[in-house]
């Protein structure tokens, strides 16, 4: 049986198979697995999708075949484990294979305690690290707490480790004078910052960081800087600067000041010279590839007893005088990009790989977009972050947890410069289901044809365009709380916050998607949206509201069952017509209907509806490779709709509840002027037809 047949055997379509053939690494992985002779199951396919280079595919495939790997989460854990012996793999599987009933009982216990979905998911991950997520999804189906959402956001900064953070003045410094000077400058205020790179768009994960930085400072009457980490002019633009400022303000945050790392570039050049004079920095002429190779070699040699620092760089012992000369040459542009870098001469006792002589500055011979100046020598992220935190007297430097290993070089550098040291505090990234948030991954999807503000993305601009209120986004990220452990939050929890906000602010209007012409025998004057409407002998209802089969479970119009028309009367079927149906219009006193449906007096107001579904099919798209899980075709359907007159006076971003269809937001693709009007609405959240 060839590979195509194997893939069809796990229910992949021919279209999907042809798409996979464009991914040579994936095909190679699948061929390796097929050649083992093992059954090619969906889990074997998942292994092929997520396996990195040098992964022990054959061993892991055998473990799946032998029944040691029972779910995709455990498989992902094995892959992260790296190359191990079979016995080590088996021990890992046994350690993280759990009794399904124990997991179910654990979930049900938390449900009895009225815990939120997010809390249950987080606690489940802590207790059963590599549990089968399908168990969670099944147990949490239709689990909705009837608890005010304010309960989840009220005390979010008073829970967990964050309530034990230091007060200004309590964080230790190299000297007492450094702290005294800091307190004189700040008056003991809490000072935080939000430091995005202007090389992409903010997403919902950034909303969590924004809320933490701004709300923590606000709680203590402090201030927050919006500081751009603009150390790489190759990837930055004024458009991205302005877009980030717009997003921050749209979410409701007003920074004390907008600053940038580039405000301090000249100061950092002088600091670099200070470090050279202290013999704590040197100019290195190794390429970046050679630097990486030498670091790897040094770690290996050190483990074997040879800790010669010159393995890291043959230029490490260059004299101070010569380093000053070489650095001046860098500043004057006498070296090309990549020919020379400034490296920190760090203590090598630490096992932290980020203490292996980090690059402090490099040559990028181009004009900085924001400053409109060519600095030639640009500081690295590691250099700029700690220096700018110190210069802005940041008291609480919040970072996502992957920055944990950066703490050591952060404090080493500030101590060598005799500068004030802020405290770094790490929190977990926000991960939500059915999407990806990584800038690298989103960029790859953008390359497939989507825009950064596509409503299927959970970028701030994408969510705004889709119609998510800023208040709902903020309340959601606050409800998740601040933790160190990572978990995936069900996107339905976010949607529940969005729904609650929209119920309060969205204007109700009538919309019909599949119009059915209805001839009525008796005309009257009705009321629609509180405005009198002349009803002629023709109206329109939605085809989905009429069932010709007289199904007893159908609660709207049938040939034997009347239905109410909102603010008009009761419709009773008489007979079919060539282009519709004929009905009698009765009063509610004459006939009590089971249900009321929307209707229109005409089809004069045609609009475009963009019906969005999740961009990814799986709860965790990364489990099978996010590009294999993406659904570009079925995640957007564009259809026509017909609306009542109240919708005509809409503005961009106005939010509507189209009765019994869903919540919609007026898109900026709409044309609204005196000469032309074309309205486009994005589906924010659908409603059940019987809502």
Curated annotation (Swiss-Prot):
Annotated signal peptide: none
EC top class, as a word: ligase
InterPro entries: aa-tRNA-synth_I_CS, Gln/Glu-tRNA_Ligase, Glu/Gln-tRNA-synth, Glu/Gln-tRNA-synth_Ib_cat-dom, Rbsml_bL25/Gln-tRNA_synth_N, Ribosomal_bL25/Gln-tRNA_synth, Rossmann-like_a/b/a_fold, tRNA-synt_1c_C2
Residue sites binding L-glutamine per the record: 229, 381
Pfam families in the record: tRNA-synt_1c, tRNA-synt_1c_C2
Catalytic reaction annotation: tRNA(Gln) + L-glutamine + ATP = L-glutaminyl-tRNA(Gln) + AMP + diphosphate
Residues bound to ATP: 197-199, 203-209, 429-430, 437-439
GO cellular component: cytosol; mitochondrion
EC number: 6.1.1.18
Top-level taxon in the UniProt lineage: Eukaryota
Motif ('HIGH' region): 196-206
Name the record gives this protein: Probable glutamine--tRNA ligase
């Amino acid at each position: 049986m060839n590979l195509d047949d194997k893939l069809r055997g796990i229910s992949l379509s021919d279209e999907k198979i042809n798409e996979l053939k464009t991914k040579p690494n994936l095909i190679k992985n699948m061929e390796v697995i097929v050649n083992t002779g093992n059954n090619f199951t969906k889990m074997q396919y998942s292994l092929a999708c997520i396996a990195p280079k040098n992964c022990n595919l054959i061993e892991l495939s055998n473990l799946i075949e032998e029944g040691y790997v029972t779910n995709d989460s455990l498989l992902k854990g094995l892959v992260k484990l790296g190359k191990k012996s079979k016995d080590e793999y088996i021990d890992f599987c046994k350690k993280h294979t759990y009794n399904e009933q124990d997991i179910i009982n654990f979930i049900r216990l938390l449900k009895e305690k009225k815990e939120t979905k997010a809390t249950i998911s987080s606690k489940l991950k802590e207790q059963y690290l590599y549990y089968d997520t399908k168990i969670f999804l099944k147990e949490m189906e239709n689990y909705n707490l009837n608890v005010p959402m304010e309960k989840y956001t009220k005390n979010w900064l008073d829970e967990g480790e964050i309530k034990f953070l230091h007060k200004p003045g309590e964080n230790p410094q190299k000297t007492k004078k450094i702290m005294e000077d800091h307190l004189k400058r700040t008056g003991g205020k809490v000072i935080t910052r939000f430091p995005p790179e202007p090389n992409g768009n903010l997403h919902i994960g950034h909303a969590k960081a924004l809320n933490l930085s701004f709300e923590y400072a606000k709680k203590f009457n402090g201030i927050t800087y919006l500081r751009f980490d603009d150390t790489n002019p190759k990837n930055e633009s004024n458009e991205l600067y302005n877009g980030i400022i717009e997003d921050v303000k749209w979410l409701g945050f007003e920074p004390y000041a907008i600053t940038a790392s580039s405000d301090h570039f000249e100061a950092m050049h002088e600091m670099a010279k200070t470090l050279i004079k202290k013999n704590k920095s040197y100019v290195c002429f190794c390429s970046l590839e050679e630097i990486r190779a030498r670091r790897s070699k040094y770690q290996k040699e050190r483990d074997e007893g040879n800790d010669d620092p010159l393995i890291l760089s043959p230029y490490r012992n260059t004299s101070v005088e010569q380093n000053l000369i070489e650095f001046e040459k860098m500043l004057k542009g006498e070296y090309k990009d990549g020919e020379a870098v400034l490296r920190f001469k760090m203590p090598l006792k630490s096992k932290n790989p980020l203490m292996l002589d980090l690059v402090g500055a490099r040559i990028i011979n181009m004009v900085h977009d924001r400053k409109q100046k060519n600095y030639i020598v640009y500081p690295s992220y590691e250099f700029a972050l700690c220096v700018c935190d110190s210069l802005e007297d940041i008291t609480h430097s919040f970072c996502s947890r992957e920055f944990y290993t950066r703490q050591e070089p952060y404090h080493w550098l500030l101590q060598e410069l005799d500068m004030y040291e802020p405290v770094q505090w790490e929190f977990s990234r926000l991960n939500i289901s059915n999407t990806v948030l990584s800038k690298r991954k989103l960029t790859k999807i953008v390359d497939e044809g989507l825009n950064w503000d596509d409503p299927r993305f959970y970028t701030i601009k994408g969510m705004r365009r889709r119609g998510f209120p800023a208040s709902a986004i903020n309340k959601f990220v606050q409800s998740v709380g601040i933790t160190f452990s990572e978990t995936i939050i069900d996107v339905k929890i976010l949607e529940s916050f969005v729904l609650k906000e929209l119920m309060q602010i969205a204007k109700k209007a009538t919309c019909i998607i599949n119009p059915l012409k209805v001839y009525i025998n008796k005309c009257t004057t009705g009321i629609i949206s509180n405005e009198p409407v002349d009803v002629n002998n023709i109206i329109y209802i939605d085809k989905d509201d009429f069932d010709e089969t007289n199904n007893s479970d159908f609660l709207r119009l049938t040939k034997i069952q009347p239905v109410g028309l909102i603010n008009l009367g009761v419709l009773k079927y008489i007979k079919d017509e060539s282009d519709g149906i004929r009905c009698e219009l009765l009063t509610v006193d004459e006939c009590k209907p089971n249900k009321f449906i929307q209707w229109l007096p005409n089809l004069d107001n045609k609009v475009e509806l963009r019906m969005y579904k999740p961009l990814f099919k799986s709860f965790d798209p990364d489990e099978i490779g996010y590009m294999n899980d993406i659904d570009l075709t079925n995640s957007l359907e564009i259809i026509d709709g017909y609306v009542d007159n109240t919708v005509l006076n809409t503005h961009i971003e106005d939010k509507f509840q189209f009765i019994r269809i869903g919540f919609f937001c007026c898109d900026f693709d709409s044309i609204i002027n005196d000469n032309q009007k074309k309205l486009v609405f994005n589906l924010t959240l659908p409603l059940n037809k019987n809502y």
